[in-house]
């Protein structure tokens, strides 16, 4: 299910590794995918991009790879892990 562009912008800025990433603001998933596949310089950035792209269109095969929650949680630093866990808690409470 696609969410609004504003929702993705709001979520994207919670992941510091994506602050200057192309495709986050304004939201452009194709641009973010290319950046994550070719130019992202650390695991925080790649896993954060994969997470957003998976939320946007889960069935698509993104160039940067599929989001793996277990791998991301192991690789993310504390700030990025917290951003994900905060999102997960909000989604759980909304259901």
Regions found by a protein language model. Name each.
Residues 1, 90-95:
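Short intrinsically disordered terminal tails
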């Amino acid at each position: 299910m696609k969410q609004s562009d504003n929702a993705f912008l709001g979520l994207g800025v919670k992941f510091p590794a994506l602050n200057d990433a192309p495709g986050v603001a304004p939201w452009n998933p194709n641009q973010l995918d290319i950046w994550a596949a070719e130019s992202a310089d650390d695991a925080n950035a790649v896993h954060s991009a994969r997470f957003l792209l998976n939320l946007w269109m889960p069935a698509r095969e993104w160039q940067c790879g599929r989001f793996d929650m277990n791998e991301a949680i192991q690789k993310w630093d504390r700030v990025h892990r917290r951003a994900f866990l905060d999102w997960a808690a909000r989604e759980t409470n909304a259901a």
